[in-house]
Amino acid sequence: MNIAFLAHDKKKELMVQFCTAYKNILAKHDLYATATTGRLIADNTGLPITLLLSHKQGGHQQINARIAYNEIDLVLLFTDPNTTDVWDDSQMIETIRHCDKHNVPIATNLASAEIGRASCRERV
């Protein structure tokens, strides 16, 4: 299973905690992330992550392209509902739209990520 990770700045630590808690499950899958999020996950968990560009340099577009080419099976995108960064929000919304268009499950918070994690376990 190919899993992509993205997170608003204020949610990166939560993403790291999630990946730390489930690293034994995640280690059985191919993992992709934008640069900063991916480095944080890799540095804190030891998980091998394919690092894409940072979101401001096109990392979201790289993930969106992989979604469009059916190369991503699950997206974990932890969002900050209180963000005021319109550009950042537009990038996140575009990724959500790609997931909807190509029927790829997406988790935007911890509760929905738990459902995705359960799916990972079943698909190993």
Regions found by a protein language model. Give the residues of each.
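Histidine-anchored nucleotide/phosphate-binding helix
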Residues: 13-24
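Short internal beta-strands
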Residues: 28-37
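Short hydrophobic/aromatic-enriched beta-strand-loop microsegments
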Residues: 30, 47-58
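Short, acidic/small-residue loops that bind anionic groups at enzyme active sites
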Residues: 32, 94-114
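Mid-chain, well-packed structural core segment of small domains
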Residues: 60-98
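Residue-level detector of conserved catalytic or cofactor/ligand-binding positions
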Residues: 114-124
